[in-house]
Amino acid sequence: MIVYLFPTEMEAAPFRSACPEAEIIISGVGMVATAATLAKLDREGRLGECCAVVLAGIAGSYGGSVAVGDVVEVLSERLVELPKAFYKEYSVEAATTLRGVVSNTVHRSTEACGAEVENMEGATLFAMAVELGFRAVEIRAVSNIVGEPFERWRIGEALEALAATLLLYK
């Protein structure tokens, strides 16, 4: 069983339209919302060894290390919201042939840990997967360069690329 987890309905909409039979859950934005959603799914018995959770959404690219519009698989998440002494890294094995990248969950500094992209949910997914024993896959489409003004973000383009990529691996 595959559960597709999206932070927002906006991120899910193109894939939902293209694949209405998919099990799609909207987690809400951020680490706490993602943890609460995964805990609820676990409590309902919907997670486990036979389940894969695919977290999909947009991400920002540090310094253009990944081009806007590109879709990547996150293989390593670094929780950098805490002081550097408490940074925590979570990794998974590749599940696709997409380019694998390192991501920060919530922005701090690219020099701090060499991340290529950032998002707000990924480290939670990987930590919960280790704790609860389900397979985690994170697919992100780059919508912007970190730090650029919101009006320059190319969200529509990124979401179309994300949906097309998810259809290849469903």
Regions found by a protein language model. Name each.
Residues 1-3:
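Extreme N-terminal starter segment of soluble prokaryotic enzymes
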Residues 9-170:
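Glycine-rich phosphate- or other oxyanion-binding loops that anchor nucleotides, phosphorylated ligands
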